[in-house]
From Swiss-Prot:
Function: Catalyzes the acyloin condensation reaction between C atoms 2 and 3 of pyruvate and glyceraldehyde 3-phosphate to yield 1-deoxy-D-xylulose-5-phosphate (DXP).
Protein name according to UniProt: 1-deoxy-D-xylulose-5-phosphate synthase 2
Pathway: Metabolic intermediate biosynthesis; 1-deoxy-D-xylulose 5-phosphate biosynthesis; 1-deoxy-D-xylulose 5-phosphate from D-glyceraldehyde 3-phosphate and pyruvate: step 1/1
Top-level taxon of origin: Bacteria
Quaternary structure and partners: Homodimer.
InterPro entries: Dxylulose-5-P_synthase, THDP-binding, Transketo_C/PFOR_II, Transketolase-like_Pyr-bd, Transketolase_BS, Transketolase_C, Transketolase_CS
Reaction(s) the record says it catalyses: D-glyceraldehyde 3-phosphate + pyruvate + H(+) = 1-deoxy-D-xylulose 5-phosphate + CO2
GO molecular function, one term: magnesium ion binding
């Protein structure tokens, strides 16, 4: 496809080039940068809407602040595509989220302009404050700048950082990227006022800027600006939450007006002596009408046609695990009034939106607040409800103490629905669900399941609904199922019991979770070598089906465990049982296949599992090595 015409952007290799440009050229550069991002993401897919919303902010921040000496920290990081183009990575921008390409998030190892990596929310203020503390103690670092969205700033960690920043009183810049509030009326008047300001203006303090914005507006517009300020701060304009915390508050300002942004940032940089919060109002998907008109503002997109906005998604071969979860939850909720759903700002991503649309009073979206989601679910369980708490595996890590203290310790029957278990593809290591098997199985009272296919997901959800003897967790992967027929309703499984898929007598492959198909393929390869193979589906990591494991050990010469989780997960639990019962001293060789002890960069899931050594060929090779050359020779 034709690339956009970008004569001004072509002059930018690094942010220092922006600092030599006029304001008019910077505005033109932003327009060209937006076109470049749209063009690039149309070829790669990715987080388009959030990136389009911060184009002007990206240009203005890099033009005003001395990055990389000044430390720019993007919260979440999924809006960083314009930032990457401006910081020496334009030549690789069309490798976003691909194997050996650019990460879709900020990443310290990728560029000195990414001083702090991100992909989970609400960390930026803490990190930027850390840089400010390092500067005060003599380290060679400049100002700390955090760019955080209105969703991310709602999380508890962000408020902890704001509270600490206000208490320390260090020079710090927090830019609130507010893309949910429309304040169109005051934009023009504020722009005219702020354009008259400069870093050399006679204003004595930043408070003059903050207070002067509203005072220079006509009465109806001033009231609108004050309402916007009240909504974002939670207090009356005369006593904002941020000001109570020790911040100077400036805003709201138009996050797409280059003159206004430059004037505000330059004045703030020149005059700040303590923490400053700049409230910039932006539009998610700005400048690309298909994104602006979309319900999710093209938050995450596949490759698409720039002219039409039509996404190029391949037709699914089977329903996704997420959609099966959503429909099954609705079906069960219709039969049981005690079933409720809980999500932490991901109703669509988790599939819980299916229940939310049908029974909105039975779904609770708590925002980006996993800790609260877990304990809130615990409270509902204690109150007699059956909460299904649906959180991605990598995000559930954020609520681990609550799982331990508020759920497991009290043996409360919270049902944890853990989507995105295993490797997830283009989002890379930050979103991989690698650790939940180990960290959940370590807890007393916890039951841990993983489904081999979408039909098993339905059965395990029914099992979770019926389980009232403590918390229970069900992990399942991102993407399509295997295409098996779905039952009309799930069967309640016996807790701690697996199943044998096929019987053999030489090698046993014991799979936990969605790698069962690879286990079957490995069995086929081994059978072609003359080996008789048993394939079993563990179903449960906790409690283990020790009867099944003992039987496999007794009847086979090799046992191979397979899982989509980290070391010390399911395989570790099996080894612990075998060691405790003296079975590692016997005739059966044991090998555990799991994710390696390292983080795996983005690629397709198939490429990532190949990198991890978890293909069918890897499973077969592990079995052959466990059997030994002499055994194989005897069967040749």
């Amino acid at each position: 496809m034709d690339r956009p015409h970008t004569p001004i952007l072509d002059q930018v290799n690094y942010p220092s080039d922006l600092r030599r440009m006029s304001n008019a050229d910077l505005a033109q550069c932003a327009d060209e940068l937006r076109a470049e991002v749209i063009s690039a993401v149309s070829e790669t897919g990715g987080h388009l809407g959030s990136s389009l919303g911060v184009v002007e902010l990206s240009v203005a921040i890099h033009a005003v602040f001395n990055t990389p000496y000044d430390k720019l920290v993007w919260d979440v990081g999924h809006q960083c595509y314009p930032h990457k183009v401006l910081t020496g990575r334009r030549d690789r921008i069309r490798t976003l989220r691909q194997k050996d390409g650019l990460s879709g998030f900020t990443k310290r190892s990728e560029s000195e302009y990414d001083p702090f990596g991100a992909a989970h929310s609400s960390t930026s203020i803490s990190a930027a404050l850390g840089f400010a503390a390092a500067q005060d103690l003599g380290e060679a670092t400049g100002d700390g700048i955090a760019v955080i969205g209105d969703g991310s700033i709602s999380a508890g960690m962000a408020y902890e950082a704001l509270n600490n920043a206000g208490d320390l009183g260090k020079r710090l810049f927090v830019i609130l990227n507010d893309n949910e509030m429309s304040i169109a009326p005051p934009v023009g008047a504020m722009s005219k006022y702020l354009t008259d300001l400069s870093a050399k203006s006679p204003l004595a303090t930043l408070k003059d800027i903050a207070d002067g914005v509203a005072s220079h507006l006509p009465e109806p517009i001033r009231q609108g600006a004050e309402r916007a300020r009240e909504l974002v701060t939670g207090h009356q304009p005369s006593a904002t939450l941020f000001e109570h915390l020790g911040f100077t508050y400036i805003g709201p300002v138009d996050g797409h007006d280059m003159e206004e942004l430059l004037t505000t940032l330059r004045a703030a940089k020149a005059r700040a002596t303590g923490p400053v919060l700049i409230h910039a109002v932006t539009v998610k998907g700005k400048g690309y009408s298909p994104a602006e008109l979309s319900d999710d503002c093209y938050h995450g997109v596949a490759k698409f046609d720039v002219a039409t906005g039509q996404q190029k998604k391949s037709a699914p071969n089977a329903p996704s695990y997420t959609s099966v979860f959503g429909q099954t939850l609705l079906n069960m909720a219709e039969a049981d009034s005690r079933i409720v759903g809980v999500t932490a700002a991901m109703p669509g991503g988790t599939g819980i939106s299916t229940l939310q649309k049908a029974k909105p009073n039975r779904v609770f979206d708590v925002g980006i607040a996993e800790q609260h989601a877990v304990t809130f679910s615990a409270g509902m369980a204690a109150g007699g409800l059956k909460p299904f708490c649906a959180i991605y595996s990598s995000f559930l890590q954020r609520g681990y103490d609550q799982i331990v203290h508020d759920v497991a310790l009290q043996s409360l029957p919270v049902r944890f629905m853990i989507d995105r278990a295993g490797l997830v593809g283009a989002d890379g290591p930050t979103h991989a669900g690698a650790f939940d098997i180990g960290y959940l199985s370590a807890l007393p009272n916890m039951t841990v399941m993983a489904c081999a296919d979408e039909a098993e997901l339905v059965h395990m959800m029914a099992t979770a609904a019926a389980h009232n003897d403590g918390p229970i967790a069900l992990r399942y992967p991102r993407g399509e199922g295997t295409g098996v027929a779905l039952p009309d309703q799930g069967d309640v499984l016996e807790i701690g019991k697996g199943r044998v898929i096929q019987d053999g007598h030489d090698v046993a492959i014991l799979s936990f979770g969605a790698h069962l198909e690879e286990a079957k393929d490995a069995a086929t390869a081994l059978e072609a070598r003359g080996l008789s193979v048993t394939v079993a589906d563990a179903r449960f990591a906790k409690p283990l089906d020790t009867t099944l494991i003992d039987d496999l050990m007794t009847k086979h010469s090799a046992l191979i465990t397979v899982e989509q989780g980290a070391v010390l997960g399911f395989g570790g639990l099996v080894l612990h049982h075998l060691a405790a019962t003296g079975q590692l001293d016997g005739r059966c060789a044991v090998r555990t296949l799991h994710l390696p002890d390292r983080f795996i960069d983005q690629a397709s899931p198939a490429e990532m599992y190949a990198d991890a050594g978890l293909t069918a060929d890897d499973i077969a090779q592990a079995a052959l090595e466990a059997m030994g050359v002499e055994v194989l020779a005897a069967r040749a």
